[in-house]
């Protein structure tokens, strides 16, 4: 509503999208008929107690990765310039075991021992594996867009409060709110890597952007390096195969 008021009703088109429900994802994609200059895959959940999506996926992988994978795949032919995926420094906690197709399928379906932060890290590692594999496929197939990944550092948003609220832990919620106010950078600054990846001219495809400050927690956008496993092409290819299988969306 705020965006509508500031920009005008005529320039804002709101589409209902629930990333935990592939039926909703498909419906939203069908609703969008215009060409898309920049598709930003930003929505997510963080470190919540174990639950599954309507399609039976572990909720964080289902929402943060599979929902976006399906939505972007359904819109692929309408994207003309860039696909930007928002990851996180939490990808450093990601661990997909031996990285086989069967193991990745088990992680996506919640068949592995669950730790809220570990699952969040996996979903954010999946964002990076997806981005770098998408850029390789875009080049190989002469698709008209590039893929980019970004992370916001430690930014003051409501995301940090969701997990303690879901667990009913008031003290943890208040500590998160205090850390947000004392340590985190403003939300607008955390959005700058996304804006840069969406608009900066001549940005090399497959770039990963984040804050330039200490430990990439705060600052202005710069090109950053993900952990080495995020560039593993075999792992990325396996995740892509599992993602197509589970989502029912083929990028071919």
Predicted regions and their residues:
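Rossmann-fold NAD(P)H-dependent dehydrogenase/reductase core
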Residues: 1-168, 246-251
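Short glycine-enriched, charge-decorated loop/helix-capping segments at active-site entrances
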Residues: 57, 224-229
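Non-catalytic terminal and boundary segments that flank Rossmann-like NAD(P)-dependent oxidoreductase
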Residues: 99-103, 227-252
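A short acidic, glycine-rich active-site loop
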Residues: 109-120, 175-184, 228-229
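C-terminal helical subdomain
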Residues: 123, 174-223, 233-237
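Alpha-helical packing segments of well-folded alpha/beta enzyme cores
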Residues: 127-130, 190-193, 239, 243
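Flexible internal linker/loop segments at domain or repeat junctions
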Residues: 165-177
């Amino acid at each position: 509503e705020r965006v509508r008021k500031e920009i005008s009703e005529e320039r804002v088109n709101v589409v209902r999208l629930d990333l935990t429900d592939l039926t909703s994802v498909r419906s939203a994609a069908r609703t969008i008929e215009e060409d898309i200059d920049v598709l930003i895959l930003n929505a997510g959940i963080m470190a919540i107690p174990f639950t599954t999506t309507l399609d039976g996926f572990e909720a964080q992988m289902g929402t943060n990765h599979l929902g976006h994978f399906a939505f972007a795949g359904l819109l692929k032919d309408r994207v003309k310039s860039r696909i930007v995926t928002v990851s996180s420094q939490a990808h450093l906690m990601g661990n997909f075991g031996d990285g086989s197709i069967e193991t990745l399928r088990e992680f996506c379906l919640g068949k592995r021992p669950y730790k809220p932060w570990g699952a969040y890290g996996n979903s954010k590692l999946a964002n990076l594996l997806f981005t770098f594999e998408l850029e390789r496929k875009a080049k190989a197939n002469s698709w008209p867009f590039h893929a980019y990944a970004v992370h916001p550092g430690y930014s003051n948003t409501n995301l940090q409060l969701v997990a303690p609220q879901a667990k009913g832990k008031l003290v943890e919620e208040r500590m998160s709110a205090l850390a947000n106010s004392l340590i985190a950078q403003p939300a607008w600054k955390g959005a700058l890597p996304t804006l840069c990846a969406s608009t900066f001219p001549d940005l090399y495809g497959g770039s990963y952007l984040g804050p330039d400050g200490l430990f990439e927690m705060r600052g202005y956008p710069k090109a950053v390096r993900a952990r080495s496993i995020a560039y593993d092409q075999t792992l990325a290819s396996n995740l892509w195969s599992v993602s197509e299988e589970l989502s029912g969306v083929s990028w071919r």
